[in-house]
Amino acid sequence: MEYVLIYNIWFFSFLQDKPCFCFVDYACSIFLLSSYCGNCLTAVATKPNEMATTPKSIPLLTLVLLPSTTPSSSVLINVSSVSFFSSLESFCFTLALLSLLIPPLKLLCVKTKFFPLSSSI
């Protein structure tokens, strides 16, 4: 079976009057809520049909990028909807394209996982 390597990204939401991040484990589809803490950011993409089951709606897909030379600042790239990505392959392609277009930037505290190519968002 072939596998593809994807990056983890944040989904931003407001919970309990403070910024929080909804972490979605793509492998087991378990939702974990975590408050923003320093530079510790970790998340993966969620499937569209799971959006309605989250405690709060998450309207924007936010890629958190950190300039390599200035750790104190970050750049947010918003996509109107997760359904913008028709498949896991297009999602990976978009991330790869972004890394080429913005070489000085890197994903903040990026983590990686392997998923079957047959998976879809």
From Swiss-Prot:
Please, which domain of life does this record's source organism belong to? Eukaryota
Q: What is its main location?
A: membrane
Keyword vocabulary terms for this entry: Membrane, Transmembrane, Transmembrane helix
- Listed GO CC annotations: membrane
Q: How is it placed in the membrane, per its record?
A: Multi-pass membrane protein
Localization of this protein: Membrane
Could you list the residue ranges that cross the membrane? Answer: 26-46, 57-77, 90-110
Additional comment? Partially overlaps VPS64.
- Its protein name is Putative uncharacterized membrane protein YDR199W
User: Lineage from the top down?
Assistant: Eukaryota, Fungi, Dikarya, Ascomycota, Saccharomycotina
